[in-house]
């Protein structure tokens, strides 16, 4: 029996079993009780696009680094911070400090920001919009997972009161490793966003044409979270509602105005109005595209259109008490634009009263176009832009805070009605000053009935087209909105699609990515564990090989006490 006990302790199986149990206990004990080891969340990448060979935004998308706090001077790390902490930080210096990635947490509900915070947030957006960096920059909503990640990162970055505590923290503290899914920002060569064109025909090929134009894509510092409800969701909705309202006048030959009307939803408006440029090129060439031919519409029906005025609509959904007519120069008195302006001012004087102002801005051929109408003006086609924004540099134009809650539906409906009344008055050649030229006669006669602009329909259009991000770099979102736009517009007029060839510019994908934050021990901790295991095995081997005499003496003592 003595030999059997000695052989049992010398057995390699016992050595292997003890080693395995020790390793499992050490690994399992390295994590805190109840702690989530891995957290997965969605993050949204800082914008990236190229115009005239210049790349703006962040050029990288891949994240696979250890997380550190703001201001840490370390290379190949992911700097994790909140938007409030960035307010007092030199963003340009932050790009220079890190060569890995940046993760910024923003409020989960932006509607809850007060006026002071909104202004601060817009100031931060301006810095991010002008950024040019090689880092992978992501933004994520602030939630419970963000609180946990920030706590671990900040705890590890805090300086311990003593050197020993700092050493122990470095050896045993958790680190956060953040990785991203491997997606390429390069869009497939086959991807081309679409222009959607609807038409109401007067039945006369020689009849002049009025064109309504609105780009449907969105853009901000973080396009994946920007629904662009006002810019330019309100423009999309305005064109759809105007199409629905004006189509009733074209249902019967007896009420059909002597004008053709085009409704053009253009792609890549935030990319120097690529869709508008493409449509103008097609228009001047006579629409020879294959997509146009597949529409089954008469080619002559479009190529013979003489555009008297292109009315571009952008951001008309905020309550500002009126809007602006933007033009390249002051229109001549008898021009269509001048007549439209006078009619807008007349109808704006009827309740509810609004203020309509003309704003002129010279067109620059060496920079990107400030307004959509400039693309028409460059080709010597008359065009104006109607907008509540006084300037193309207004920060609300490309803001994450351009949310559906910021829209005033009643204001949008009033503006749509005002535009519809003015255009109807022009194409039907009604008196500019109302039904009577006698100033003593007061009348509020209008062409549209009280409920012509349908509130429920406008509300539905806002939910469908102005409540979701639709950056041109998101192929799925772009294809979805163009499909829905074409489907809705086809219910009121003839519609065709035209694939847009983007030139002198480039859009990039990966507007949204999946990030994984994993809690791991530092690499030096593994060395300490390895040293401990080696020490244990050495001690166990020594005891196992030198314990025969001890065991024999113990067995002899037990046998003697028994017998």
From Swiss-Prot:
Keyword Endoplasmic reticulum: yes
InterPro entries reported for this sequence: EF_Hand_1_Ca_BS (IPR018247), Nicalin (IPR016574)
One GO location term (cellular component): endoplasmic reticulum membrane
Residue ranges that the UniProt entry lists as topological domain Lumenal: 30-522
Tissue: Expressed in body wall, pharyngeal, and vulval muscles, excretory canal cell, head and motor neurons, and vulval epithelium.
Effect of a null allele: RNAi-mediated knockdown causes a moderate resistance to nicotine-induced paralysis. RNAi-mediated knockdown in neurons in a hyperactive mec-10 (A673V) mutant background increases touch neuron (TRN) cell death.
Subcellular location: Endoplasmic reticulum membrane
GO biological process: protein-containing complex assembly; regulation of protein targeting to membrane; regulation of signal transduction
Segments on the Cytoplasmic side according to the record's topology features: 544-563
Residues spanning the membrane: 523-543
Residues of this chain annotated as glycosylated in UniProt: 232
Alphabetic keyword roster: Endoplasmic reticulum, Glycoprotein, Membrane, Signal, Transmembrane, Transmembrane helix
Signal peptide extent: 1-29
Chain's role: Involved in the recognition and selection of protein complexes to exit the endoplasmic reticulum (ER). In muscles, regulates levamisole-sensitive nicotinic acetylcholine receptor (L-AChR) subunit composition, possibly by allowing only specific L-AChR subunit combinations to exit the ER. Specifically, may promote the inclusion of alpha subunits unc-38 and unc-29 into L-AChR. Regulates L-AChR sensitivity to agonists such as nicotine and levamisole at neuro-muscular junctions. In touch neurons, may prevent ER exit of incorrectly folded mec-4-mec-10 ion channel.
PANTHER family cross-referenced by the UniProt entry: NICALIN
UniProt record similarity statement: Belongs to the nicastrin family.
Protein name in the entry: Nicalin
Organism listed in the record: Caenorhabditis elegans
Lineage: Eukaryota, Metazoa, Ecdysozoa, Nematoda, Chromadorea
Encoding gene (name): nra-2
